Each structure stands twice: as structure tokens, then as C-alpha cells.
């Protein structure tokens, strides 16, 4: 697509079903590498990163069949442990294959990741945590060369700061480590919990023993499973904000409202009328938008992935608003473009 032309001043009315979560699907796809059994994943979104991750799994030897949001994976002959730059460079989640490859083969060579330019997003937290499971690593010419000569060995690990990616990598790796691993200061995003639920469905032994604390008993074998990925809360939040911006009347289906209660509560305070049912949120936008201050934060705080959308909405506010970005240091690139359109930021 070279150009997308938007005709504004139209209200968003109607109803829409929310897609499966990309951010939940990617670590789950990486985790399938642990299994030598058939895995069936449902409700996968049809987006570029999903296809890239599937291509990465295929390059490692996985056999896949993706049709109508459903992916069947067979790893009977999966014996490769090299994740190339050509695939990992476009997607941050590519580094998530490091943990399962180490668990399966005791060594791996994985390219440093690429992805969107919204900050440094270093992987040092991943590597330092993996080293506590017995991993030795070095970075040579853009690749992580990692080995676990004695296999992965369970340990007590406390993340120095909350990291979604590091939490995911360690959960996957520890699921087949020898003994027990206790992870503290974990990210608790719904996508993390979806990953845990998927691994449990494969026969892994994982238990939450505190708000941000996990106990993982390593298993030698996994079992065949069928699993449906959770809804995309960022997509849901984007449609809710878009309805508020356009003063629309929108019903959003195929979601769990309690997971996005922070976003719902903020939209209510701003002036939107919202009704909630079991798997549905009905929003009616308001002409009068109340200004407010917002700070991004790890879940259950306001998500950084909705910060730009919320900024557009607050441009319509009745007073000054303040947005503080506490997750990434370079995520205000949209400000200049909004100012070109007449915003005062």
C-alpha cells in the first residue's frame, strides 16, 4: 500500500468483532518449539508479524498449515537451532525463539532483533536472566551465540525491571529446565497470562504464587494441544478511542471487558458513555471531551501502544492535557505530524 486516503468528519457506527492478539500469538508461536507433538492454534490474526514468525518456525524445521485463523504446527523433524537475521530483523519477537531452542538443543544462534524504532528495547535482561539458568553467551557480528552445556537448570530469578519480552523468554525456557524456577518481578500483561495458559495446556507446570511471581517446574515432555489465542486488547482500545474521537456509536464484540477496564474507565472520565456486557462493550462518543492527564505504565496501567491514539482524542479536550510516556523514550514521533494537522502540542 503506497497511500491511504482518509475522508474525515464521519462517525464510526455499527459493530465489530475484535481479532486475536498479535502480542499474545507471537510468544505462543515461539513456545511451540518446545513440543514434538502436534499443536493447533486458533484465532491467530492475519498480520505481517504472524506470517514472519511462521516463516521463522519453518526455517527452523517446523511444518505448518495456516488457514482461516487456524495454524497447525508439527515439530516432529524440527532440528535446526539457527534463527537468521533476514527473518528476525523485522520483528522484535524473533528473540523469543532463543529460550525454547536452548531448552531443546542446549545451544542456539539467534540474530539480534529489529522491529519498530520506539526506543532501544535492549535484550540484556533476557540474556542475564538466561545466564542464571546455566546459559553462557556471547554476541558476535549481530548474533547471540548461546550454550547451556549441562542443559537449563532451574533457579531463582528476579528481573531488575519489568520486561514483557524477558518474562516471556524465561517462562518458555524454564518450562523445560531441570528442577524448579521461581521468577520474580514478572510482567503481568494479559498476553503473559495467555502464554502461561497455553504452556499449561501443553502439559507444563506453571503456577502464579504472587502478583508478579511465578513458580515453574520443568517437564521433559509436552503433550498435543489445541488452544485459542486471546483477543487483541490494543485493537479493542483503538476502536473505542476512534469511536470517542468521531462521536460514534459502536459495539465491540469478542473481548473480555475486565481486561481493558483501565482504558474503559479513562474513556468514561473523558466523557464517553459506555455500557458493558459479558463479551461486548458499547460506546457512544460525546461532543464534549474532558481534558485529563495520562501516564503510560506496565499492565494494569494505561498501555503505551494506545498512547498516540489517546493523544488524538485529547486534542479535542476542553482544556490542557498532559501525557507522560514512561515505557519508551522515543514514542512521541507522531506529535510533529499532529501539529501539522492543526493540533497544539
Task: Briefly describe each language-model feature range.
Residues 1-345:
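Short, structured segments at the rim of ligand-binding sites
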Amino acid at each position: 500500500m503506497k497511500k491511504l486516503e482518509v475522508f474525515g468528519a464521519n462517525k464510526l457506527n455499527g459493530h465489530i468483532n475484535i481479532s486475536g492478539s498479535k502480542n499474545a500469538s507471537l510468544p505462543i508461536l515461539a513456545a511451540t518449539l518446545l513440543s514434538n507433538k502436534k499443536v493447533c492454534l486458533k484465532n491467530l490474526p492475519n498480520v505481517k508479524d504472524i506470517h514472519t514468525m511462521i516463516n521463522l518456525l519453518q526455517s527452523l524445521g517446523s511444518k505448518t498449515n495456516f488457514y482461516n485463523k487456524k495454524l497447525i504446527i508439527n515439530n516432529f523433524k524440527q532440528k535446526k537451532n539457527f534463527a537468521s537475521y533476514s527473518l528476525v530483523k523485522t520483528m522484535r519477537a524473533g528473540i523469543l525463539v532463543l529460550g525454547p531452542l536452548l531448552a531443546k538443543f542446549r545451544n542456539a544462534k539467534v540474530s539480534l532483533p529489529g522491529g519498530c524504532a520506539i526506543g532501544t528495547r535492549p535484550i540484556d535482561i533476557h540474556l542475564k536472566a538466561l545466564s542464571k539458568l546455566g546459559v553462557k553467551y556471547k554476541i558476535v557480528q549481530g548474533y547471540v551465540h548461546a550454550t547451556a552445556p549441562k542443559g537449563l537448570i532451574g533457579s531463582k530469578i528476579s528481573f531488575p525491571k519489568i520486561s514483557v519480552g524477558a518474562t516471556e523468554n524465561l517462562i518458555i525456557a524454564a518450562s523445560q529446565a531441570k528442577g524448579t524456577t521461581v521468577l520474580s518481578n514478572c510482567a503481568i500483561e494479559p498476553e503473559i497470562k495467555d502464554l502461561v495458559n497455553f504452556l499449561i495446556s501443553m502439559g507444563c507446570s506453571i503456577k502464579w504464587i504472587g502478583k508478579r511471581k511465578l513458580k515453574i517446574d520443568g517437564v521433559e515432555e509436552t503433550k498435543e494441544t489445541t488452544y485459542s489465542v486471546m483477543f487483541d486488547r490494543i485493537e479493542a482500545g483503538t476502536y473505542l478511542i476512534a469511536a470517542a474521537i468521531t462521536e460514534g456509536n459502536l459495539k465491540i464484540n469478542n473481548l473480555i471487558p475486565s481486561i481493558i477496564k483501565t482504558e474503559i474507565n479513562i474513556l468514561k472520565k473523558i466523557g464517553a458513555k459506555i455500557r458493558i456486557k459479558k463479551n461486548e462493550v458499547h460506546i457512544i462518543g460525546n461532543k464534549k471531551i474532558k481534558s485529563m492527564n495520562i501516564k503510560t505504565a506496565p499492565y494494569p496501567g494505561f498501555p503505551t501502544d494506545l498512547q498516540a491514539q489517546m493523544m488524538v482524542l485529547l486534542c479535542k479536550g476542553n482544556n490542557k492535557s498532559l501525557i507522560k510516556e514512561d515505557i519508551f523514550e522515543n514514542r512521541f514521533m507522531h506529535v510533529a505530524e499532529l501539529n501539522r494537522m492543526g493540533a497544539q502540542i
